[in-house]
Swiss-Prot record:
<keyword id="KW-0648">Protein biosynthesis</keyword>
<feature type="binding site">
    <location>
        <position position="567"/>
    </location>
    <ligand>
        <name>Zn(2+)</name>
    </ligand>
</feature>
<dbReference type="InterPro" id="IPR018162">
    <property type="entry name" value="Ala-tRNA-ligase_IIc_anticod-bd"/>
</dbReference>
<dbReference type="InterPro" id="IPR003156">
    <property type="entry name" value="DHHA1_dom"/>
</dbReference>
<keyword id="KW-0694">RNA-binding</keyword>
<dbReference type="Pfam" id="PF07973">
    <property type="entry name" value="tRNA_SAD"/>
</dbReference>
<dbReference type="InterPro" id="IPR045864">
    <property type="entry name" value="aa-tRNA-synth_II/BPL/LPL"/>
</dbReference>
<keyword id="KW-0436">Ligase</keyword>
<keyword id="KW-0067">ATP-binding</keyword>
<dbReference type="InterPro" id="IPR018165">
    <property type="entry name" value="Ala-tRNA-synth_IIc_core"/>
</dbReference>
<feature type="binding site">
    <location>
        <position position="669"/>
    </location>
    <ligand>
        <name>Zn(2+)</name>
    </ligand>
</feature>
<comment type="similarity">
    <text>Belongs to the class-II aminoacyl-tRNA synthetase family.</text>
</comment>
<dbReference type="InterPro" id="IPR018164">
    <property type="entry name" value="Ala-tRNA-synth_IIc_N"/>
</dbReference>
<dbReference type="InterPro" id="IPR012947">
    <property type="entry name" value="tRNA_SAD"/>
</dbReference>
<protein>
    <recommendedName>
        <fullName>Alanine--tRNA ligase</fullName>
        <ecNumber>6.1.1.7</ecNumber>
    </recommendedName>
</protein>
<keyword id="KW-0479">Metal-binding</keyword>
<dbReference type="Pfam" id="PF02272">
    <property type="entry name" value="DHHA1"/>
</dbReference>
Length: 872
């Protein structure tokens, strides 16, 4: 039986023998494509070639690609663990042709590999072909069908509809028919009962798709019409885990050697056995799948967070923790302990797991601990909600309450449902779903972009000349209109550009496009599928005219200084803190720089000072830039250049050197370190577990900051009568202020006690109710303290109502004893209505509520209104 490693290697070896160049997996986290957060298919790293933005270096390519599918079109997350074949992170084996071979070779080689190399039984294989689409004017893919007929009987060739057998990159872009290969893994007796043909694409767990051959031959335009692609593309993808299942004779991906070591480790940790309990098995599969996703995301530079891709990873991690907590009794952090098992299983194929082991473990552990605390908070809130619901005589909590738990506190709906079932209660799912849809719609509206078709003026690709020039004559290749948030913008592609497109943490250049007719402002430059896009607010009236592309040199110079400073900072951090320092992110703007790096504790003030001294010493040394442009990657490594985890490098790279600082980098830099001027670190903080962040200024911004500091010191000296030692004067002031504050607090306590005693002596008893009312210029906190003290002493029939002035703002406070609440009075309802008299509003709990307002003259009337509403 072939192992997973042998299967992966056999695929690469087979296609290498067919003239394919084997490329490494791209990072799972995507950084230069605004339409995607994660690599969700093998073709993602080739999008710029498929879209025609760059020529293909190799016309035949194959690889094994790390993929992640959790959102959008490929949303498999909620199915993961519940069936035998869906995953979040998976490997995609694929082969591509860019303008070389097409359907015939793709089908022939797929058959040869599956049947002749892997020895799969051909009688168990089925192929689907596109049946055509009359409304699109597309006929059946008879060409693909004719090639399959060489290998398969006609009843094993199945027509598929547009949904299953016409692949599209998105709403616009390359597309075409596809042919899926399915395998029937059922035992013979099951195959005798019903044909596999009838189960293809019907979600049968043992009749599954293993390979999809996509024949890209069209381009979908913004108006929905299709046009032929200039160069046809073959894009195939085969699910590695499913292939392992088929070859190893298993009925579940999780029964293969891809997952079994992890499942056994989880079972041992939980004191159970895989295969004994359905719900526990689901939990173990969820964890076994999700630990891979989380670990690989962290190695590729994406940490869990509350935004965008980071939020997706946090969600996946929390889903795994929740299943462990609910079904496996894992009440403490546990997932980080599984990393050695993952490394044993996949470390050879993906050595980045080994290199990043310490960081991955720490991030996962801290995320687990934080979410376990959240779960405890959520359970307490749910307990209160259940109590309030039962007190109202109901057994169903509102969907809005459940959504608040989910959205604000990260408390999952299915866990809410589980706890409710245990207490004989339910949740209004329709209300919950309505709240969820409203939130999704708000997010869609915020992110919605309308993109027009590209208008092509001339063919060609973009040459970047920005390392050598800040002005360059250029012509527009193509442009399109986009609309976002009620703003119309234009994206312009030039044949040559000195504009640096945002990447590697450095923001894009701004500037102008100048022709003999007009000047167009470039407000940003982005990179989309490796293509520099110039963003403008208006389109040139004469787009075919040649123009000078002129970069804003002041902003460019400031960016260059900050970018070079990050390199010096990285080098200095390694020298001061240790060689474990690895860059985890950066942001370089004209105003400042931000640098994220792996480190497991706070950087001390003394260490920051040492780092600053080292960086500024190199700046004063005026070290010249040494640039190695377009050199082989192996040569770069021999130079000692530092590569970033999660970045994909080509075979030829650019290296930037300032003395001992040597890094792979495609950004803009100063000619010599002296141009930076000076570096001043302005903050150091934690970003995530094991990741610290430094923010700093350079050059003129340091000067501005020093001016501000000097102005502040001068002002303080003036305030302290030009004391010779400002530090001593401030400390003395703080000590004196603390003493005075203590005196005020003591006075307020005495006043509070005195007022309470007076109120007790002046209780009015009306219809058996002990009414305490007053109006005084007191802080809200003092009134609250008095109210709770009185409630502790008068346990029945207490009706407390007070008007107060807190910093000139009128406040109304009501406190009721429990028996009055039980009798139907609600403090919140009383203050809500009475607050109108002080032009305000408020609320609170049934026994205690407050309201604030604007009209101080209405306080006494508001007090009387409370009594009137209560019927007193």
């Amino acid at each position: 039986m072939l192992t997973a490693k042998e299967i992966r290697d056999s695929f690469k070896n087979f296609f290498e023998s067919k003239g394919h160049h084997i490329v490494p997996s791209a990072p799972m986290v995507i950084k230069d494509d605004p339409t995607l957060m994660f690599t969700n298919a093998g073709m993602n790293q080739f999008k710029d070639i498929i879209l025609g933005n760059h020529p293909a270096k190799y016309h035949r390519v194959a690889d094994s690609q790390k993929c992640l599918r959790v959102s959008g079109k490929h949303n498999d997350l909620e199915e993961v663990g519940h069936d035998t074949y869906h995953h979040t992170m998976f490997e995609m084996l694929g082969n591509w042709s860019f303008g070389d071979y097409f359907k015939k070779e793709a089908i022939n080689w797929a058959w040869e590999y599956l049947v002749e190399v892997l020895k799969l039984n051909p009688e168990h294989l089925y192929a689907t072909v596109f049946e055509g689409s009359p409304e699109e004017g597309l006929s059946r893919d008879d060409e693909a069908a004719s090639y399959w007929e060489q290998y398969l009987p006609k009843d094993h060739i199945i027509n598929g509809n547009k949904h299953d057998n016409f692949w599209e990159m998105g709403d616009t872009g390359p597309c075409g028919p596809c042919s899926e290969i399915h395998i029937d893994l059922r035992p013979a007796e099951e195959r005798a009962k019903i044909s596999g043909r009838d189960l293809v694409n019907h979600d049968h767990p043992q009749v599954i798709e293993i390979w999809n051959l996509v024949f890209m031959q069209y381009n979908r335009k913004a108006d929905g019409s299709l046009e032929p692609l200039p160069a046809k593309v073959i894009d195939t993808g085969m699910g590695f885990e499913r292939l392992c299942m088929a070859l190893q004779g298993k009925t579940s991906n999780y029964d293969t050697d891809v997952f079994q070591p992890m499942l056994k480790a989880i079972a041992a940790m939980s004191g159970t056995e895989y295969g004994k309990d359905k719900q526990q098995d689901i939990a173990m599969r969820v964890i076994a799948d999700h630990i891979r996703t989380i670990a690989f995301s962290i190695t590729d530079g994406q940490l869990p967070s509350n935004a965008k891709a980071g939020y997706v990873i946090r969600r996946i991690l929390r889903r795994a923790v929740r299943y462990g907590y609910t079904f496996l009794g894992q009440k403490q952090s546990f997932m980080y302990k599984l990393l050695p098992v993952l490394i044993d299983n996949m470390g050879d194929a993906y050595p980045e797991l080994i290199a990043q082991k310490g960081l991955i473990e720490k991030v996962i552990k801290e995320e687990e601990e934080a979410f376990l605390r959240t779960l405890e908070t959520g359970i307490r809130l749910l307990d209160k909600t259940m109590g309030d619901t039962k007190a109202a005589g109901k057994t169903e909590i509102s969907g809005k309450d459940a959504f608040t738990l989910y959205d604000t506190f990260g408390f999952p709906l299915d866990l809410t449902e589980l706890i409710l079932r245990e207490n004989g209660m339910t949740v209004n799912i329709e209300e919950f779903n309505a709240e969820m849809q409203q939130q999704k719609q708000r997010a869609r509206n915020a992110a919605a972009i309308e993109t027009g078709d590209w208008v092509t003026l001339r063919e060609g690709t973009t040459e970047f000349v920005g390392y050598d020039y800040t002005e360059y004559e250029a012509s527009i290749l193509r442009y399109r209109q986009i609309k976002q948030k009620n703003q119309t913008l234009y994206q312009i592609v030039l044949d040559c550009t000195p504009f640096y497109a945002e990447s590697g943490g450095q923001v894009g250049d701004t500037g102008v496009l100048v022709s003999e007719f007009e000047t167009i402002e470039v407000i940003d430059t982005k990179k989309e599928n490796n293509l520099p896009i110039h963003i403008t607010k208006k389109l040139p009236e004469h787009p075919e005219a040649p123009m000078m592309a002129c970069v804003d040199t002041d902003k460019r110079a400031a960016c260059a200084a900050n970018h070079s400073a990050t390199h010096l900072l990285d080098s200095a951090l390694r020298e001061v803190l240790g060689e474990h320092i690895e860059q985890k992110g950066s942001l370089v703007t004209p105003d400042s720089l931000r640098f994220d790096f792996s480190h497991f504790q706070k950087v001390t003030d003394e260490e920051i000072r040492q780092v600053e001294h080292l960086v500024n010493a190199k700046i004063r040394a005026n070290i010249p830039l040494k640039e190695y442009r377009n050199i082989p990657i192996e040569e770069a490594k021999e130079l000692g250049a530092i590569a970033l985890f999660g970045e994909k490098y080509g075979e030829r790279v650019r290296v930037i050197q300032f003395g001992s600082s040597i890094e792979f980098c495609g950004g803009i830099h100063v000619a010599a370190t002296g141009n930076i001027g000076m570096v001043k670190i302005i903050s150091e903080s934690s970003v995530a577990a094991g990741v610290r962040r430094i923010e700093a200024y350079t050059g003129a911004r340091v000067e501005e900051m020093l001016d501000t500091i000097q102005d502040t010191i001068s002002e303080l000296k003036s305030l302290f009568n030009n004391a010779p030692d400002l530090g001593i004067a401030i400390r003395k002031y703080i000590e004196e202020n603390a003493g005075l504050k203590k005196q005020v607090e003591d006075y307020m306590k005495e006043k509070e006690a005195s007022l309470k005693e007076r109120l007790l002596k002046n209780i009015q008893e009306i219809h058996g109710i002990k009414v305490i009312k007053f109006c005084a210029p007191l802080p809200a906190e003092v009134v609250k303290n008095i109210a709770f003290q009185l409630r502790g002493e008068i346990t029945e029939n207490l009706f407390f109502v007070a008007g107060s002035l807190d910093n000139g703002k009128p406040m109304l406070t009501v406190m009721l004893s429990d028996n009055l609440v039980a009798g139907g009075l609600k403090a919140g309802n009383l203050v809500k209505e009475a607050a109108k008299l002080i032009q305000g509003g408020g609320g609170g709990q049934p026994h205690f509520a407050t309201a604030g307002g604007k009209n101080t003259d209405g306080l006494n009337a508001a007090i009387e209104k409370v009594l009137e509403l209560a019927g007193i």
